Amino acid sequence: MNIRPLHDRVIVKRKEVESKSAGGIVLTGSAAGKSTRGEVLAIGHGRILENGEVKPLDVKVGDIVIFNDGYGVKAEKIDNEEVLIMSESDILAIVEA
């Protein structure tokens, strides 16, 4: 994938969610709902502050993150793969191993 987000934007690939129904049936994809976890594929250079300085992002490529899947998060299809473009402020947490 050849994409470079600008400023404080982050490209995230949503992780598939797997859950079980009350009867123990494993649900995947749309039946399980949309995951709010994903892997960071690319990051911008950082947020531009009022004084003109660039603040580097806290997330890095490869991080697994939990994000707010709402207004401001844009889904795009790039190289036949759906990715999400969001601001770093849409990321709520980094999952640490």
UniProtKB/Swiss-Prot annotation:
Superkingdom classification of source: Bacteria
SUPFAM superfamilies: GroES-like (SSF50129)
Protein name in UniProt: Co-chaperonin GroES
Signal peptide span: none
Function per UniProt: Together with the chaperonin GroEL, plays an essential role in assisting protein folding. The GroEL-GroES system forms a nano-cage that allows encapsulation of the non-native substrate proteins and provides a physical environment optimized to promote and accelerate protein folding. GroES binds to the apical surface of the GroEL ring, thereby capping the opening of the GroEL channel.
Keywords for this protein: Chaperone, Cytoplasm
Subunit structure: Heptamer of 7 subunits arranged in a ring. Interacts with the chaperonin GroEL.
Family statement drawn from the similarity comment of this UniProt entry: Belongs to the GroES chaperonin family.
The keyword Repressor appears for this protein: no
InterPro entries attached to this UniProt entry: Chaperonin_GroES, Chaperonin_GroES_sf, Chaprnonin_Cpn10_CS, GroES-like_sf
Gene Ontology molecular function terms on file: ATP binding; metal ion binding; protein folding chaperone; protein-folding chaperone binding; unfolded protein binding
NCBIfam families (alphabetical): PRK00364.1-1, PRK00364.1-2, PRK00364.2-2
Alphabetical list of HAMAP family matching this protein: CH10 (MF_00580)
Gene Ontology BP annotations: chaperone cofactor-dependent protein refolding
